[in-house]
Amino acid sequence: MTHLLIVDDEKDIVDICQTYFEYEGYQVTTTTCGKEALKLLSSDIDIMILDIMMPEVSGYDIVKKMKDMQLDIPFIYLTAKTQEHDTIYALTLGADDYIKKPFSPRELVLRTNNLLARMSKSNHSNKIEQLEFDGLVLKNLSKTLTINNIEIPMRIKEFELLWYLASREGEVISKSELLEKVWGYDYYEDANTVNVHIHRIREKLEKHDFLPYTITTVWGLGYKFERSR
């Protein structure tokens, strides 16, 4: 049974989400307190849905603490913060989805189901186990990236995006296709999702002096993973 943690200081939202997810067969743990959420973080949690604006401890703080604990729990922000810069910042923290209030509980359940299904499919896929490019090695089963035998920390979505691009080396892939194949939805309001993740991947490759290959922006069309010119 999938263990879901819901964190929101609005009890009515917590209650309705709990009702919907328990009906879907989830084991649900809830709290309306950010401080309490910090105590509930553990490897026993399979996925987390959390608000951002909460007294004392925000949704940002909870995610940062999760990273400090070296937990890799997929999470969805459910928030009234609707500005583009809010979405971008949440994605830089590694959010797997960003849903704005007011929201449809049914849509939230479906998005969560789809996220978990993609993760399960990705984790159990053995069609291609490994890609290698002049010292860069991507291992699909373990979701790890190494450069010259040094493992580079990556969030799951960063890895999946790089894997998708690298597995189609030299091809131009549109943002809409990347959104559909990596995130599982075609949501143009969140087109910056791809930009943010591409930027973070490039930073990691450059930080570790990986120069033979690069992710190239093809203006008006998309991105491609190719040998550096």
UniProtKB/Swiss-Prot annotation:
Annotated DNA-binding residue span(s): 128-227
Domain of life the protein comes from: Bacteria
Protein's cellular compartments: Cytoplasm
Main location class: cytoplasm
Matching CDD domains: REC_OmpR, trans_reg_C
Any one GO MF annotation of this record: phosphorelay response regulator activity
Modified residues (4-aspartylphosphate): D51
UniProt-listed InterPro entries: CheY-like_superfamily, OmpR/PhoB-type_DNA-bd, Sig_transdc_resp-reg_receiver, WalR-like, WH-like_DNA-bd_sf
Keyword Transcription in record: yes
Entry coiled-coil feature ranges: none
Cellular component GO terms held in the UniProt record: cytosol; protein-DNA complex
Post-translational modification: Phosphorylated by SaeS.
SMART domains noted in UniProt: REC, Trans_reg_C
Example GO BP: regulation of DNA-templated transcription
Ranges of residues in domain Response regulatory: 3-116
Pfam families registered for this protein in UniProt: Response_reg, Trans_reg_C
Keywords assigned by UniProt, alphabetized: Cytoplasm, DNA-binding, Phosphoprotein, Sensory transduction, Transcription, Transcription regulation, Two-component regulatory system
PANTHER family named among the record's database cross-references: REGULATOR OF RPOS, RESPONSE REGULATOR SAER
Function: Member of the two-component regulatory system SaeR/SaeS. Probably functions as a transcriptional regulator via a specific DNA-binding domain, recognizing motifs near the promoter sequences of target genes.
Protein name listed in UniProt: Response regulator SaeR
Taxonomic lineage of the native organism: Bacteria, Bacillati, Bacillota, Bacilli, Bacillales
